[in-house]
């Protein structure tokens, strides 16, 4: 298949095997952004873990300081009372218990995040086949099972991203939009990497952050020189 002018320009801009300072990497991505929509800026982080071992799987969440640029719809399972009121006050689109579960079983799943208080998991547990395949099942490891639903809703809406290692030991995550300021993208990536460092498994040996690459939705992957980031 013949390459488009854009693909040729991208190929010419990125030197295979070269790691670019973060600022240069973002400039390459922004210059290659030609889609008719605002593309996302994504990151792939190869970790020094054996993803086949359960004690080396990395999973968690990070609240990006500059947000994700996305509007997030949140549903909360919480019993009627203070916790439900707290979730509604924080901006949740839907709050309930059995009534909310029935709606979801009927196909009402227009949510990006589902949160539950611990005492609501007896209801949520029955929705495993509905929420699980969509990546919506609440989990304490990523902050979506919480005794403080208001805080969890605020985190979700202010730019919380969830991550977990894939079979190759790589974390994939969105750190913003192509129209974000460079400093905003850098602060988001730094926050994510610092949380990944905190989540390093005790049994992981050798170099932990092996490779960091950024890309746009329709653009190339560019390796980032980690020395251009402040990770302390």
Curated annotation (Swiss-Prot):
Coiled coil, from the record: none
Annotated keywords: Repressor, Ribonucleoprotein, Ribosomal protein, RNA-binding, rRNA-binding, Translation regulation, tRNA-binding
Gene Ontology terms describing biological process: regulation of translation; translation
Signal peptide region: none
The keyword Ribosomal protein is annotated on this UniProt entry: yes
SUPFAM superfamilies: Ribosomal protein L1
Recorded GO MF terms: rRNA binding; structural constituent of ribosome; tRNA binding
GO cellular component, one term: cytosolic large ribosomal subunit
Entry superkingdom: Bacteria
Key word DNA-binding present: no
InterPro entries per record: Ribosom_uL1_bac-type (IPR005878), Ribosomal_uL1 (IPR002143), Ribosomal_uL1-like (IPR023674), Ribosomal_uL1/biogenesis (IPR028364), Ribosomal_uL1_3-a/b-sand (IPR016095), Ribosomal_uL1_CS (IPR023673)
SUBUNIT field: Part of the 50S ribosomal subunit.
HAMAP family in the record: Ribosomal_uL1_B (MF_01318_B)
Cited NCBIfam families: rplA_bact (TIGR01169)
Sequence similarity: Belongs to the universal ribosomal protein uL1 family.
Task of the protein: Binds directly to 23S rRNA. The L1 stalk is quite mobile in the ribosome, and is involved in E site tRNA release. Protein L1 is also a translational repressor protein, it controls the translation of the L11 operon by binding to its mRNA.
Protein name from the UniProt record: Large ribosomal subunit protein uL1
């Amino acid at each position: 298949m013949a390459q488009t002018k854009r693909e040729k320009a991208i190929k010419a801009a990125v030197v295979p095997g070269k790691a670019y300072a973060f600022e240069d990497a973002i400039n390459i991505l922004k210059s290659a952004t030609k889609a008719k929509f605002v593309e996302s800026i994504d990151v792939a982080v190869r970790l020094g873990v054996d993803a086949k071992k359960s004690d080396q799987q990395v999973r968690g969440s990070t609240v990006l300081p500059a947000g994700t640029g996305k509007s997030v719809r949140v549903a909360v399972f919480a019993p009627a009372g203070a916790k439900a009121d707290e979730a509604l006050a924080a901006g949740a689109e839907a709050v309930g218990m059995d009534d909310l579960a029935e709606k979801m079983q009927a196909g009402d799943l227009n949510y990006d995040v589902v949160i539950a208080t611990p005492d609501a998991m007896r209801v949520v547990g029955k929705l495993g086949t509905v929420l699980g395949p969509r990546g919506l099942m609440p989990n304490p490891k990523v902050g979506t099972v919480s005794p403080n639903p208001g805080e969890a809703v605020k985190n979700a809406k202010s730019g919380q991203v969830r991550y977990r290692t894939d079979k190759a030991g790589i974390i994939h995550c969105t750190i913003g939009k192509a129209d974000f300021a460079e400093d905003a993208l850098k602060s988001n990536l730094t926050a994510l990497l610092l949380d990944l460092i905190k989540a390093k498994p005790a049994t992981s040996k050798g170099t932990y952050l092996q490779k960091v690459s950024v890309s746009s939705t329709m653009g190339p992957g560019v390796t980032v020189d980690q020395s251009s980031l402040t990770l302390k």
